[in-house]
Amino acid sequence: MTITTQTDARKLRARLKHPIIDADGHWAEFAPDMRAEFRRIGGDTAVEALDMASARIPNSLRMSVAERRRRRIGQEAFWFLPTKNTLDRATAMMPRLLYERLDDLGLDFCVIYPTAGLGYYRLPPEKHRRALCRAYNVFTAEQFRPYGDRIIPAAIIPMYSPEEAIEELEFASKQLGLRVVMMGSLIRRPIPALVEDHPEAAKFVEWYDPIAIDSEHDYEPVWQKLRELRIAPSFHNGARSILLRNSPSNFCYNHIGHFASASEAMAKAIFLGGVTRRYPELNFAFLEGGAGWACSLYADLIGHWEKRKLDALENTKPANLDRTGLLALAEKYAKPEVVDAIRRGEGLDDNGDGTGGVEDLDDYSRCKIASKKDFEDLYVKRFYFGCEADDPINAWAFNRKANPMGARLNAFFSSDIGHFDVPDMTEVVPEAYELVEHGLLDDDDFRDFMFTNAVRFWGEVNPDFFKGTVVEKQAAEVLAKPR
């Protein structure tokens, strides 16, 4: 097989004055090797856990459409890894080949996330979940350790409880030397009322815990541990085959928008839960969902604050209704039946005078918003958004005219190499550059998208993150400059 080295990606990279960091590539873990290594690392428990986690999608695909419809099980991805492009398939499987091809792909540095392991943090039995994540983290660290100057893998952090998260953070950071983490979130939990009143049904209906707001667990120690370890958390959660993305016959129906949906839930919880207010030392990344949802959420959070902050609630407070004035208007403009109802005080408090038992009426109280400027500090500066190369909506993040207060959101390049939506790994960097060629980004925007924002995401939290890498000097120059 001939390996082409004079790729368009290599040529484009040679013209640029800055490195390129891929903030979210994927490798395709080779199951037979992984199984053998898991047994060595974690024994029978790790292998049992691997078998449990690996069975879900194949079991679903073995069902007929009719059976999935009967059970309301979503259609999963079939044929999701490269096959026709054999070189890319091998590149996704073999870390050394990826390392050797980075220049051909136009990449200086790459952060690698799981494929099979993306959902390992969800495995329900605690014993197996923790063994599975531990074995995976050891396995991945060993696989990529020789290539650390250009490739860093992400550790999987289970989050069903703060205790298991802290233990794995400590191990991954201090024992394995990993400095990228993929945090579990949208944790499936039983509904207490069903457990108490209908225990036979409780296992079939769950709620999704975004951990940063209204959780039954206190995750404050997790944020504290991330700050202590100087680790910027990333979230690569999906919402496929649940709720409104649960077609039993159409994978694309389930797949489109599911990363954005999950990311929005997490970002909204972290913001409204006040995490960015309490931990300004941390940055947070939401991967593979693009930036369109992030721009929309940013504007919507501001819009809701303007209408629902405490002083704005005076506009809808039931006690502020001038009933005498309303009656006078009704007597002039309404039919007699309406006048009589208003005179009796009927129909004027659609929801009564209740507030649902909420003592603090300010939904933004945890993040202590005093002015619109706070949204820049707590949202714009703290959140980062992984965007694939072929998404033209990436340009929205950099559009100061479209975003409130002239904001540029922190979109960064996330290639998704190794998955079905990248048929040729050598094309992702040129594809990203099309935003410049089409006039949607300028050169400064492209530099920030492909390099600067990734440096700031990890480097602001851990200034030593890029030490020993091929981009150490350029990253240090970025971090030495004020925003």
Residue ranges and their predicted role:
Residues 73-87, 117-123, 203-204, 251-256:
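Short glycine/proline-rich turn/loop motifs
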Residues 115-116, 237-242, 417-420:
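Short glycine-enriched loops at secondary-structure junctions
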Residues 19-21, 233, 411-413:
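Residue-level marker for buried hydrophobic side chains located in beta-strands
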Residues 20, 81-90, 100-123, 150-156, ...:
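Divalent metal-dependent hydrolysis catalytic cores, especially in the metallo-beta-lactamase
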Residues 3, 131, 144-152, 157, ...:
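Catalytic pocket-lining loop regions of alpha/beta-barrel enzymes
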Residues 87, 91, 125-136, 161, ...:
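Residue-level preference for long, well-ordered alpha-helices that form the structural scaffold
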Residues 104-106, 115-145, 149, 162-173, ...:
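Active-site loop-helix segments enriched in His/Asp/Glu that coordinate
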Residues 2-19, 29-109, 138-146, 167-171, ...:
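Mid-to-C-terminal alpha-helical segments outside catalytic/metal-binding sites
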